[in-house]
């Protein structure tokens, strides 16, 4: 039961197909407060060197980004020329900004035509990407962005496409395909086709079939870009079938997906000792925001309730709640209204909350990939962070060993005291 829960939460996909429903126009969401952040200064050359539109540079400055990350430095110059791109780079290094900036740079808005299609495997990630487009197109008032996903009435999406057709569409494959099949969404003018966390969509056969059908509805001549933090050697040939002579960028070798600045520890304990240990650690550790990962919806609800009873400012996100509630809670956490988030794997991939500096694996993830995506919620954008994993049985210990072997990282037992400066920025 718990395993199925985890799988469904991670993919969040079958709901797209069964509930004939979807998300609204991105413009209806509450305005997003600007959150300052800065990528690690790997390259002294700034974004200006990419010769981006002045409107884009202005938005980049507003976001507080000064220097491109390594993946941006490698990808953006080619991506803005319309080249196909296949990119793997570790979590938290700004892959989303690569395709957002590259497509906005090339976009020439035509009324009533969708030019850019971005797809990802969960609704929350789709919502977040649409917000990034809004953030970076702040000084491009003619650009319209919409997001479509399962969970709300399809009629609302059809109205948006009919009355206020966007130039950029972000969504999940199930809903995008439904809108394309009923002729509400016209894909004949697509110039840029993007898959974010592409491995998750192409590994699942039902989702891959949907992506392929959507792909065939778009023009032959277009730019295709695919991104992920984990891209196995088996899935790369599948990605290439969608592309023409792509530029391939693997910023890190598969075995070296370590996160610089992230301290990783484990705690050995019994399952019934987890709550007490968690409360003790939350009392002594310094944190901006914390994400606590659990394995099922039931545990998510119970732990969040327990934390609130212990006067910790916690909020829960899981697939058992209505779509509007999930997005509302995500936005509350992002806006710093709550400092502790309890979540299932649903929140594990690609979600950007820049203030998170501690991630807890209250329950051990089911594999090393999921471990990477979970702990990468802390220490994003090259900042410092702390990941603590609870190990309560032999299976947990085995997975932890797999993580250490695969990523060539040494995860040691949590010491009695940790130097605060090792996991929190002192000048935030």
From Swiss-Prot:
* Top enzyme class: hydrolase
Mark out the compositionally biased spans (Acidic residues).
Answer: 1-19
Where is this gene product found? Answer: Nucleus; Nucleus speckle
**What's an example GO BP annotation here?**
mRNA splicing, via spliceosome
Q: Which reaction does it catalyse?
A: ATP + H2O = ADP + phosphate + H(+)
| Keywords annotated in UniProt | ATP-binding, Helicase, Hydrolase, mRNA processing, mRNA splicing, mRNA transport, Nucleotide-binding, Nucleus, RNA-binding, Spliceosome, Transport
The record's GO molecular-function terms, alphabetically, read: ATP binding; ATP hydrolysis activity; mRNA binding; RNA helicase activity
EC numbers listed for it are 3.6.4.13
Q: CDD domains of this UniProt entry?
A: DEADc_DDX39 (cd17950), SF2_C_DEAD (cd18787)
Helicase C-terminal domain location, by residue?
261-422
Matching entries from InterPro entries are given as:
DEAD/DEAH_box_helicase_dom (IPR011545), Helicase_ATP-bd (IPR014001), Helicase_C-like (IPR001650), P-loop_NTPase (IPR027417), RNA_helicase_DEAD_Q_motif (IPR014014)
**Which Pfam family, just one, is annotated for this protein?**
Helicase_C
| Sequence ranges assigned to domain Helicase ATP-binding in this UniProt record | 76-249
Q: Where is this motif: Q motif?
A: 45-73
Q: List residues binding ATP.
A: 89-96
This protein's domain notes: The helicase C-terminal domain mediates interaction with ALYREF/THOC4.
Q: Which family does it belong to?
A: Belongs to the DEAD box helicase family. DECD subfamily.
Question: Whom does it interact with, and what assembly results?
Answer: Component of the transcription/export (TREX) complex at least composed of ALYREF/THOC4, DDX39B, SARNP/CIP29, CHTOP and the THO subcomplex.
Its name, as the record gives it, is Spliceosome RNA helicase DDX39B
Source species? Gallus gallus (Chicken)
> Upper taxonomic classification of the species?
Eukaryota, Metazoa, Chordata, Craniata, Vertebrata
């Amino acid at each position: 039961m718990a395993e199925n829960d985890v799988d469904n939460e991670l993919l969040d996909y079958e709901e797209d197909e069964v509930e004939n429903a979807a998300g609204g126009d991105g413009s209806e969401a509450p305005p997003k407060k600007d959150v300052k952040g800065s990528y690690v200064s790997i390259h002294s050359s700034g974004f200006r060197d990419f010769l981006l539109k002045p409107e884009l540079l202005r938005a980049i400055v507003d976001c507080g980004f000064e220097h491109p990350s390594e993946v941006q430095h490698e990808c953006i110059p080619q991506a803005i020329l319309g080249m196909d791109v296949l990119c793997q780079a570790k979590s938290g290094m700004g892959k989303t900004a690569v395709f957002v900036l590259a497509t906005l740079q090339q976009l020439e808005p035509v009324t009533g035509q969708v030019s850019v299609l971005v797809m990802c495997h969960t609704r929350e990630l789709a919502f977040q990407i649409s917000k990034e487009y809004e953030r970076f197109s702040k000084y491009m008032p003619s650009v319209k962005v919409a997001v479509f996903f399962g969970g709300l009435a399809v009629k609302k999406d059809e109205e948006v496409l009919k009355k206020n057709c966007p130039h950029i569409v972000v969504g999940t494959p199930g809903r995008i395909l439904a809108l394309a099949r009923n002729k509400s969404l016209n894909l004949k003018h697509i110039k840029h086709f993007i898959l974010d966390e592409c491995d998750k969509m192409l590994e699942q056969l039902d989702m891959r079939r949907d992506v392929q059908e959507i792909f065939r509805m778009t023009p032959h001549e277009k730019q295709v870009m695919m991104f992920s933090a984990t891209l196995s050697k088996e899935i790369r040939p599948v990605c290439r079938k969608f592309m023409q002579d792509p530029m391939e960028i693997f910023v890190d070798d598969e075995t070296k997906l370590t996160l610089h600045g992230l301290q990783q520890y484990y705690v050995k304990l019994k399952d019934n000792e987890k709550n007490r240990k968690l409360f003790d650690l939350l009392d002594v550790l310094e944190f901006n925001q914390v994400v606590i990962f659990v394995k099922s919806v039931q545990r998510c609800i119970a732990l969040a309730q327990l934390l609130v009873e212990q006067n910790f400012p916690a909020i829960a996100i899981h697939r058992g709640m209505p779509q509007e509630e999930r997005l509302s809670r995500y936005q509350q956490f992002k806006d710093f209204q709550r400092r502790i988030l309890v979540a299932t794997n649903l929140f594990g991939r690609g979600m950007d909350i820049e203030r998170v500096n501690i991630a807890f694996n209250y329950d051990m993830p089911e594999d090393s990939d999921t471990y990477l995506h979970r702990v990468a919620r802390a220490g994003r954008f090259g900042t410092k962070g702390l990941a603590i994993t609870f190990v309560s049985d032999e299976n947990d210990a085995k997975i932890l060993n797999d993580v250490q072997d695969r990523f060539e990282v040494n995860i040691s037992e949590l010491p009695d005291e940790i130097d605060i400066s090792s996991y929190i920025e002192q000048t935030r």
